[in-house]
Amino acid sequence: MVIIRLARGGSKKRPFYNIVATDSRNRRDGRFIERVGFYNPVATKGEALRIAQDRLTYWQGVGAQLSPTVERLVKQAQKAQPAA
């Protein structure tokens, strides 16, 4: 099953997450099919969250499931989208 979830990057104490479409059997930071966006929780300036909505809807259309955290981030991005 394909799942859209976070893959951790960055250094110690400075997390950075890629939002990726991957097979659910792969490791958290292992091989992925496509990078759909990113989330930077420690960003002070610039953008902390970017999601390619067209690719996200494509993957959901072919049956990919969102992890609970990615669901929350997608709602957050959609809420911020009309304000921008």
UniProtKB/Swiss-Prot annotation:
One of its GO terms (molecular function) is structural constituent of ribosome. Keywords: Ribonucleoprotein, Ribosomal protein. GO terms for cellular component: cytoplasm; small ribosomal subunit. InterPro entries: Ribosomal_bS16, Ribosomal_bS16_dom_sf. GO terms for biological process: translation. It holds the Pfam family Ribosomal_S16. It comes from the Bacteria. Belongs to the bacterial ribosomal protein bS16 family. PANTHER family: 30S RIBOSOMAL PROTEIN S16, SMALL RIBOSOMAL SUBUNIT PROTEIN BS16M. This is Small ribosomal subunit protein bS16. It comes from Burkholderia mallei (strain ATCC 23344). The lineage of its organism: Bacteria, Pseudomonadati, Pseudomonadota, Betaproteobacteria, Burkholderiales.
